[in-house]
Amino acid sequence: LFAMAGMLSTIPAAYFNARVLNDTALNFFETPDIRMGVLGVFLAPGLGEEFWKMAAGLLVVSCLNRRSRPVQPAECVLGFAVVGMAFAVIENIWSYGDGGAAYLLLRGLIAVPLHTSMCMLHGVGVLLYWKRRRAWPLYVFYLTTALLHGLWDVASIYGSSVREIWLPL
């Protein structure tokens, strides 16, 4: 179930990314203003992908908790890790046509651990939510992973150009 949720979560995430890339001035690949591009990176891959991965894992955990025995803590964190791995695999398949085998290998070495670790953090947030019955861990862990994902994407897309963003500020 977790793997299927991870694969399916790529659909709304890809749609959201496409809307940001095609319908706004936040197209981080083509915008002449690097600040708008960085904002686009944080909104689309950062906030968008992390939201859909967390929602997919949370849906599975919620369904499992209602239908059978409660999901154990290790199962929750590992289940979310599976969501991240499945998401990364589908994302890499979609990206394959853009760069060839070397690019796919590099994405496999970087994107899979990134998505897996971000989803494991989602799993910890969901555990804290279920344990304490307070929503703040969901928000804190979601925003933390979105920030980390956004920072990684900014560094990988813009590289040394990132200095241009912070110097004027």
State what each model feature region is.
Residues 1-169:
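Hydrophobic alpha-helical segments at protein termini of multi-pass membrane proteins
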